[in-house]
Swiss-Prot record:
The keyword Plastid does not apply. InterPro entries: RNA_pol_inhibitor (IPR016412), RNA_pol_inhibitor_sf (IPR038715). The keyword Plastid does not apply. Disulfide bonds: none annotated. One of its GO terms (biological process) is symbiont-mediated suppression of host transcription. This is Bacterial RNA polymerase inhibitor.
Length: 64
């Protein structure tokens, strides 16, 4: 019997790019989240306490 059950824990995360800045450098880091707002929250939660500023979050667009 082959019964595939994705269950309620199945999440469709998307890739976003967060621009993170310090006083000397700026770099982009990947963030995986369901929405743009959630990606911003995750980026701020992860990088602001470490002394960085999150200046931009954008969706990852696959090249055509």
């Amino acid at each position: 019997m082959s019964n595939v059950n994705t269950g309620s824990l199945s999440v469709d995360n998307k890739k976003f790019w967060a621009t993170v800045e310090s006083s000397e450098h700026s770099f982009e880091v990947p963030i995986y989240a369901e929405t743009l707002d959630e990606a911003l929250e995750l980026a701020e939660w992860q990088y602001v306490p470490a002394g960085f500023e999150v200046t931009r979050v954008r969706p990852c667009v696959a090249p055509k």
